Amino acid sequence: TAKCADEGHVAVFGDRLKTVPVRKRASVFDTLKTVNDIGKDIGMGTEHGIWLFWKAAIEQKQHWDTVFVYSDQQAGHGGLFGSGGYSVAGRGCSWPGRRAAYIDVPMLINLYRKKVNPKVHVVMVQTAGYQDTLVPEQYDRTYILGGWSDQIIKYAATMIALRDGPQQ
């Protein structure tokens, strides 16, 4: 996906998050080796990366036009644990009324849209075949897809063009 953009990145997550720039002229295999090497030492956390990504994007005002999330979509939908007292830009981002902290990913996306880029497109790609997702299907500029195929990129580009018009 990242090689299809003018500027792309791959985020490797576990207990921490590390973002790797993807260069169009670089070998896919070299990028894969870099990503795999990072993965060996990033920690075993499986949900933490999505929260860290949006936290950094909001607090550092990183401008993203489109964010693809390839995931089993098991983080932040009100059923999985996050770190207590989680806050982004001075705002708590946990589901209300819970004793434990469950990170609210839709709240993070909305906060990003409010503070950084209201027109960001978020493409959630369900990779595990579960029947859930990180965000509600009706969110504007948010697309829920599934599977592994180069057609995902084409489909997302078509959906974005239908929403915003052709890219210049």
Features from the language model and the residues they span:
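Acidic, glycine-rich A-domain
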Residues: T1-Q168
